[in-house]
Amino acid sequence: MFRKVFSVALVTCGLLVIVQAAKKVEQCEKRIPDSLKPKLCQIRQYQLLEGADMEKHIDCVMRALGFVHPDGSGNYHALIEPLNAIDKDRKHGFNLETCGGNRDKLPKRKRAYAFYKCMLKSTSADSFKKAFDLKELVNAGKLSATAKYSPQVDTLMAQIDGMICK
């Protein structure tokens, strides 16, 4: 009986750690693979780097922001409202559909990066970056959950990036 209770408690604690680890971008950055540590500044500036380590890191970040589903595919509904709040344009729905559409054929570990990369190459890229930055700041507790994109987002991101990109 004790073993069963202990096993259930251990599994529950493990799941809580996994869920909590995916709440903030900062937590993903603390666990970034060694190969990417010297490139973190570039990554934060939305430069696309290729490789399994980058895919793993972006998967963590996109999950932390809630921009992908548990299977790594893009979450249309999590992004359409923030994108349109920044710049109301029908292109966002089209780009989210396009970027999310063909990713199901990829292995789960590659989906989030493929979606991220596609969005950064789309006509919604600027709005995507702004929504990404805003959500990062909200999740980090630096802005309220009801915050809208404003110049304050740029200021706060510049401060964070300034500490990382020395």
Curated annotation (Swiss-Prot):
<keyword id="KW-1203">Blood coagulation cascade inhibiting toxin</keyword>
<dbReference type="Pfam" id="PF01395">
    <property type="entry name" value="PBP_GOBP"/>
</dbReference>
<comment type="function">
    <text>Salivary protein with anticoagulant activity that targets the intrinsic blood coagulation pathway in the host. Inhibits activation of the host plasma contact system by preventing the reciprocal activation of host coagulation factor XII (F12) and prekallikrein (KLKB1). Attenuates generation of bradykinin in host plasma. May bind and sequester different mediators involved in the host response, such as serotonin and histamine.</text>
</comment>
<dbReference type="GO" id="GO:0140311">
    <property type="term" value="F:protein sequestering activity"/>
</dbReference>
<feature type="signal peptide">
    <location>
        <begin position="1"/>
        <end position="21"/>
    </location>
</feature>
<protein>
    <recommendedName>
        <fullName>Short form salivary protein D7R1</fullName>
    </recommendedName>
</protein>
<keyword id="KW-1199">Hemostasis impairing toxin</keyword>
<comment type="subunit">
    <text>Interacts with host coagulation factor XII (F12) (inactive and activated) (via amino acids 1-77). Interacts with host high molecular weight kininogen (KNG1) (via amino acids 402-532).</text>
</comment>
<keyword id="KW-0964">Secreted</keyword>
<keyword id="KW-0732">Signal</keyword>
<dbReference type="InterPro" id="IPR006170">
    <property type="entry name" value="PBP/GOBP"/>
</dbReference>
<dbReference type="GO" id="GO:0005576">
    <property type="term" value="C:extracellular region"/>
</dbReference>
<dbReference type="GO" id="GO:0090729">
    <property type="term" value="F:toxin activity"/>
</dbReference>
<keyword id="KW-0800">Toxin</keyword>
<dbReference type="InterPro" id="IPR036728">
    <property type="entry name" value="PBP_GOBP_sf"/>
</dbReference>
<dbReference type="GO" id="GO:0005549">
    <property type="term" value="F:odorant binding"/>
</dbReference>
<comment type="similarity">
    <text>Belongs to the PBP/GOBP family.</text>
</comment>
<dbReference type="GO" id="GO:0035899">
    <property type="term" value="P:suppression of blood coagulation in another organism"/>
</dbReference>
